[in-house]
Every structure is written in C-alpha cells, then in structure tokens.
Amino acid sequence: SMTTINRKFSDSPAASLTPRHECGVCGIYNHTDSSKLAYFGLYALQHRGQESAGIVTSNGKRVLIHKNMGLVSEVFSEETLTSLKGHISIGHVRYSTTGASNIINTQPLMITHKGITLAVAHNGNLVNSIALRNRLEERGSIFQTTMDSEVVLHLMARATDRSFEEALAISFREIK
C-alpha cells in the first residue's frame, strides 16, 4: 500500500537527503519601512514555518519586538507593523525542530546584557547544544527557553572582557 511505501521511504537514508523546510529568517537594513518589508519577507517564507512569527526592529537607539504563535497574517496587524518603527529589522517564522511548540520559544530572541540589546533569529540546529547547555547551567546560566539558539547568547555573555565581535567569534568556535 501507499502508506507502507511512504513509511519505508521515510525510514530510509534517502529520506534524509530530501529538502525540508525548517524555519525562515529575513533581515532588512537601512529602510524606513523595515518592519513592513520584514512582514512581506516572512509572508513569502511562511511555508518554512507556520507555528509562530516575530519581528524585531531598531532605529539604532531602541529595539522593539512583536512575536506570537500563529500564521504571519494572524500575528501582525497594520497597527502592529506601524508601531515597529526602525530602519533595521529581523524576522523569523518557526517550525520547531528543537524545543517545545509554545510562546516562550518564538523568535527572534531578544536579550539585554551589559546595556546592549541583542536580537537573534536562528534557522537550524546546534548539534552540541545539549552538552553546551548542561555545561552553561553548571556554571550558573539560567535558560528562558528550550531552544538550542539560546545557547549562543549565553556563550557570548560569558566572554565578558571581550568586544561584541570577539564574543560572537568565541561562541561560534564552541558550537557545532
């Protein structure tokens, strides 16, 4: 039967070679309507993730975020997009590959550390995230989500005596 064929294919090594769409990320820089452009980018990428959507914008001084569970058209209204003022935006649509499907795991992730606000939108899986998370928790890190993407932010925060760029490079050397 067709069910048997599909089940056998999905268990075969060839199944891992087929393209799969897992999350969508877009970024806009130097545009006065960056949140609306990010919205349209996410709308076009929505086939890559229909669990949740989020946009972070910045004008270089303040950072604004709006994210929620649902389709892009359900998460954002014209009013919401108008309120997300800034010339820089990043957006994310999610299909969970790691972490539970709930509001806490929507992206972009946004943190403030040492007076610097950072937003991250990540597409993919970190192979060594469990080992890194365990190590970081043993050293006092407190995680807010179950996503592996949050590990990168904690690694960066540990490089307290480094510049942003150096902290990012150090964290990337540790992840796989």
Predicted regions: what is each one?
Residues 1-176:
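Conserved short alpha-helical segments that host acidic/polar catalytic motifs at enzyme active sites
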